[in-house]
Each structure stands twice: as structure tokens, then as C-alpha cells.
A protein has these predicted regions:
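Flexible, solvent-exposed loop/hinge segments and secondary-structure transition points
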Residues: 1-112
């Protein structure tokens, strides 16, 4: 019985280049258990804040097929919205794109 998936995913869209993460996804293929950073080389004090637990924990327990980055404070009530890091929207999008890639793989690559 499958209880979930751990998928390594990357996005080349980071301000400093490649962002690589590991994403835990429940067996339903839509609920994110959490993420962990494998590699990230973003601007100190801005994009590197993606590694702060307070930012990336917003993925924990979120359910959706594709997440979207919004300005900080705009997405708290919508399950598919991720609040951007202030001053680091590009990094926020890169991490979110990697999570979306992992979700896509679970739902389209594994289930075929």
C-alpha cells in the first residue's frame, strides 16, 4: 500500500540559478506533507530566506494540483496560494515551480 511519495524536483528559475528540493506528497497525490532543500544559491538575506521554516512550512498540509505565488499576505485563505518572500518573488516562484513539478510527476508520471 502506497502511503505517500518523496520526489526530488528542481527549478532553474531561481535568481541564483537552480533550486533543488525534496517534496513529501501524500498518497492522494495532492497534499504536500512538506519540503526540504537539497541545494539553493540565492541572494543572502533575500532569496536565501526560502530556507526559513516560517516561509516554507506554508506548503505543509496544502492540497492542490498547482500552487501559485502571491504577494505576502494575499494568499492566506486560499489553499493553492503561496505567499512570496518579501523582496524575493523570483525565488518564491522557483521553489513553488519545483513543488508543482513534483505534484505533476506524481499525478502524471507515476500513475500512468
Amino acid at each position: 500500500q502506497v502511503v505517500g511519495h518523496i520526489i526530488n524536483a528542481s527549478s532553474k528559475d531561481g535568481y541564483g540559478g537552480l533550486v533543488s528540493i525534496s517534496v513529501g506528497i501524500q498518497a492522494d497525490g495532492q497534499t504536500v506533507n512538506g519540503i526540504a532543500f537539497l541545494s539553493i544559491s540565492e541572494s543572502a538575506g533575500l532569496g536565501m530566506n526560502a530556507r526559513d521554516t516560517d516561509w516554507y512550512k506554508q506548503f505543509n498540509g496544502k492540497k492542490g494540483e498547482k500552487f501559485e505565488v502571491t504577494k505576502a499576505g494575499d494568499g492566506e485563505l486560499d489553499n493553492e496560494k503561496i505567499n512570496a518572500i518579501s523582496g524575493a518573488t523570483i525565488t518564491s516562484r522557483a521553489v513553488t515551480n519545483a513543488v508543482n513539478a513534483a505534484l505533476y510527476f506524481v499525478n502524471n508520471g507515476l500513475k500512468q
